[in-house]
Amino acid sequence: MPAAADDVAATDGRPVNSGAPESAPPGPPEATGLRLLAVHAHPDDESSKGAATMARYVRSGVDVMVATLTGGERGDILNKAMERPEVRANLPRIRREEMDKAREILGVQQRFLGFTDSGLPEGDPLPPLPDGCFALEKLEDAAEPLVALVREFRPHVLLTYDENGGYPHPDHVKTHEVAIEAFEAAADPDRYPGSGRPWQPLKLYYFATFHKARITALHEELVRRGLESPYAEWLANWEDEPEGRKALEITTQVPCGAFFSIRDQALLAHATQIDPESSWFACPPDAQQAAWPTEDYHLARSLVDTELPEDDLFAGIRERVSR
């Protein structure tokens, strides 16, 4: 699990759509005409945030695209079994290969947008970011490839991180800025000329993955089953909101428990980043379905009418597309 968690406030502390686990739909899906674009900083982010949601929508006929802003070139190797000289020497290539495997597992399309990983600076004071990295790009230069992709793919819904990046990685914060710029600019023919025909996405969501209500529910389910929980220390040390900063409200909970196993397969495809013995997999999928069978989001922008809370990222959009 990441070092820091999303700052969110659940609507009532439990998923809106808890109850019997849903089943994965059988057979090939019928095309819906709906399109979803998830905007991420690095390969592996797509598998740790919103992966089960994407798998569910793909298998219900939605076209799903992942935009990956960087290649993860400066990432650490977090799986000891992969800590080998030849892996370190070829990390950019290997991370692309891992992304290809995860893409196939999830069933999504995927596009690298060509920027260089900034790395996660450590120290006090923090060292300067490396020249040429994504986080130091001018906003217009960083946003242009995403604007072009939005105009090409023409998504109805965008997913990305909140203004704090979900956790304080400079590439995640920059990804938020770039996604906001693309959402606001892609429909304006006077902005980013030469980057395709204008297109306006209708909804923008922030991931709300690692929030206290969910982690507490997973912890309690493991304890109830007599299993060891890796979350006790995390919860004990949980830092509440800084004074003056409003928690991110959960507005939308997508039931996708039947796809948690697919999410986990996609995570494992990122072998340099995910240790199969790590706390990522401490809570079995069936326990997760029982405790918290949704993936959660905050609706940040909407150009369509929708009633909150939602259980569908396309609420308010399906009717338009089906006409």
For the regions a language model picked out, list residue spans one by one.
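C-terminal accessory domains and tails appended to enzymatic cores
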Residues: 1-32, 188-323
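Active-site rim/loop-helix segments in enzyme catalytic domains that contact anionic ligands
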Residues: 2-153, 181, 298-299, 306-309
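Active-site environment of divalent metal-dependent phosphoester hydrolases
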Residues: 46, 73-76, 163-170, 212-214
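Residue-level recognition of the N-termini of beta-strands and the immediately preceding loop/turn
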Residues: 64, 156, 199-203
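Short secondary-structure boundary/capping segments
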Residues: 81-84, 175, 219-223
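Short, well-ordered beta-to-alpha junction loops that form the rim of enzyme active sites
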Residues: 113-116, 160-164, 170, 206-209
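A mobile, often basic/glycine-rich helix-loop segment
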Residues: 137, 167-188
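Proline-aspartate-enriched helix->loop->beta-strand connector
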Residues: 142, 146-164, 172-175
